[in-house]
């Protein structure tokens, strides 16, 4: 359990170090900016691997895995491959937040959920699918929101010549295209989450379920307006930040605010 906990902490530190990487690389400090990130990511992956040793022992003894445990094993493999790819593809940092977020989510489920809850989720496939889809959707939408803030910041600083162009910085058009793909992916995933969640709301009409449905739908509208505005109206800057932040706040209230009810 402690290995998994420290692995999650180092994954979070790695996520925090990805944003300054772009700024540091623009100032010619590419090696210095990569080293702290790589060390924290390496520590997270090693601790993640160690936390899976009991699962590997279960596999050797012929025991079956739960879906959560399989996801944890898959995520550490993906995280290791994506991190090593940083040395070959300079723009791989764009994918890493999604990879590390998936690792964090899988570790939380595999380590901290009680066996009773895991057994209940395994028996209810639709509920398990909905929860997994919801968590992944939130991760994608959250990363997309951080990405639009980073894009606006980079665009403004380049125009004001506060930072210099660098080979480590991808073209703004490429960054914007990647951002829009990620944002659109979040909107599609949120649509699927709302569709799958409708079934559970109809099965059990409770205040908590209605709270999640209403705020998730409002977030879907906010993200949808942002996507349409960027795609058809060419929105950039403040408008995109306002709608993106509004969407993630509404989604956060919908996903976690119901705990206060």
Cite the ranges covered by each PLM segment.
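Hydrophobic transmembrane alpha-helical segments in integral membrane proteins
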Residues: 1-14, 133-141, 261
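N-terminal signal-anchor/start-transfer transmembrane helix
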Residues: 5-27, 143, 147
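Cytoplasmic-side transmembrane-helix entry/capping segments in multi-pass membrane proteins
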Residues: 32-41, 69, 91-104, 239-246
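A generic, lipid-embedded transmembrane alpha helix
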Residues: 39-56, 78, 106-111
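Hydrophobic alpha-helical segments and helix pairs
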Residues: 79-131
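A mid-sequence, solvent-exposed acidic-amphipathic segment
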Residues: 157-199
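Interfacial loop-to-transmembrane junctions
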Residues: 228-249
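Juxtamembrane boundary at the C-terminal end of a transmembrane helix
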Residues: 253-261
């Amino acid at each position: 359990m402690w290995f998994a906990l420290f692995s999650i902490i180092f994954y979070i530190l790695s996520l925090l170090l990805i944003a300054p990487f772009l700024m540091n690389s623009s100032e010619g400090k590419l090696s210095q900016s990569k080293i702290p990130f790589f060390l924290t990511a390496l520590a997270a992956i090693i601790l993640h691997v160690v936390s899976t040793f009991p699962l590997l022992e279960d596999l050797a003894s012929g025991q079956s895995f739960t879906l959560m445990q399989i996801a944890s094993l898959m995520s550490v493999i993906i995280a290791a491959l994506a991190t090593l790819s940083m040395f070959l593809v300079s723009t791989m940092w764009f994918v890493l937040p999604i990879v590390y977020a998936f690792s964090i989510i899988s570790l939380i489920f595999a380590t901290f959920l009680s066996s009773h809850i895991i057994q209940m989720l395994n028996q209810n496939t639709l509920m398990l699918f909905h929860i997994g889809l919801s968590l992944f959707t939130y991760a994608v939408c959250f990363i997309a929101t951080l990405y639009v803030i980073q894009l606006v910041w980079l665009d403004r600083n380049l125009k004001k010549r506060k930072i210099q162009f660098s080979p480590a910085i991808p073209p703004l058009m490429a960054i914007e295209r990647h951002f829009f793909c990620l944002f659109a992916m979040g909107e599609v995933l949120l649509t699927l989450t709302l569709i799958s969640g409708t079934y559970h709301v109809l099965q059990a009409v409770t205040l908590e379920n209605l709270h999640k449905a209403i705020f998730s739908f409002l977030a879907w509208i906010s993200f949808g307006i942002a996507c349409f505005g960027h795609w058809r109206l060419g929105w950039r800057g403040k408008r995109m930040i306002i709608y993106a932040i509004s969407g993630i706040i509404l989604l956060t209230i919908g996903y976690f605010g119901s705990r206060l009810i």
